[in-house]
């Protein structure tokens, strides 16, 4: 987990976090909208009306439409995190997404859900995966979760918590590995993230963090192979994002 923190995550000496300048979506100069019409540059319009209807939300500062309880991953159940534990954003148009960060909860599935709903915790991840393979989504992927202890990595990453403790290898179950791998493959497909260890990382690998999860017992070779297999499998017919009542 990140703090910004964690429940009781193992820690290491801290360093200085890096910062990254946000990337805009469509340039303000490239997309001119006024009174519902497209501004003309010389004799040619910059964009046709039908393009504007599709792209208006990509103008920096304009958000995509949202629905309560909307999911980015069809295999998850929605449980909302406290708004104090994340920041509203419009990714990937304001911040490109190019990392998946693997965390371990240092506690139970229920305790992780509880602390992410606590505004005093000041940290959360987008997803939690249980030892039985269940997945809960608590923050939309387009929003910034306070997960990594590093602003740049918060803005560029999707975070996944895994139920258990870093010093208990038995907590890293077959069902959890398989479920998490399917989730990570789905995230990578949505955002064009390469499936490699440069882009799928542990919390311990975030610059400046004081955490050590997912710990020495996390089997990276096994996990990456499962992610690759999941990515190569036929896609689910269920569209994403989806919404559950």
Label for each model-derived stretch:
Residues 2-149:
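N-terminal catalytic cores of peptidoglycan-degrading enzymes
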Residues 2-13, 18-26, 35-36, 44-78, ...:
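Basic/polar, cationic surfaces and motifs that engage anionic cell-wall
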Residues 94, 119, 148-152, 168-179:
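Extracytoplasmic/periplasmic, Sec-exported soluble proteins
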Residues 95-96, 155, 195:
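Structured loop/turn residues at beta-strand edges in well-structured enzyme cores
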Residues 104, 162, 204:
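A cross-domain feature marking catalytic cores of carbohydrate-active enzymes
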Residues 151-162:
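Short coil-to-beta-strand
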């Amino acid at each position: 987990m990140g703090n910004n923190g964690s429940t009781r995550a193992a820690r290491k000496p801290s360093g200085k976090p890096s910062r990254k300048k946000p990337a805009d979506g469509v340039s303000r100069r490239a997309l001119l909208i006024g009174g519902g019409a497209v501004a003309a540059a010389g004799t040619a319009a910059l964009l046709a009306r039908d393009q504007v209807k599709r792209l208006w939300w990509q103008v920096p500062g304009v958000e995509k439409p949202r629905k309560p309880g909307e999911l980015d991953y069809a295999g998850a159940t929605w449980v909302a995190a406290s708004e104090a534990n994340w920041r509203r954003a419009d990714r990937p148009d304001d911040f490109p997404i190019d990392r998946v960060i693997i965390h371990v909860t240092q506690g139970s599935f229920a305790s992780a859900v509880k602390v992410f709903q606590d505004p005093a915790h000041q940290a959360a991840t987008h997803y939690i995966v249980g030892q039985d393979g269940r997945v809960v989504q608590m923050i939309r992927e387009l929003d910034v979760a306070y997960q990594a202890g590093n602003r740049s990595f918060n803005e560029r990453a999707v975070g996944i918590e895994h139920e258990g403790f870093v010093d208990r290898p038995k907590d890293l179950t077959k069902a959890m590995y398989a479920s998490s791998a399917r989730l990570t493959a789905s995230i990578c497909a949505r955002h064009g993230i390469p499936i490699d260890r440069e882009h799928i990382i542990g919390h311990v690998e975030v610059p400046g963090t004081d955490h050590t999860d997912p710990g020495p017992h996390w089997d990276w070779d096994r996990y990456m192979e499962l992610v690759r297999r999941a990515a190569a499998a036929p896609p689910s017919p269920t569209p994403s994002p989806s919404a559950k009542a």
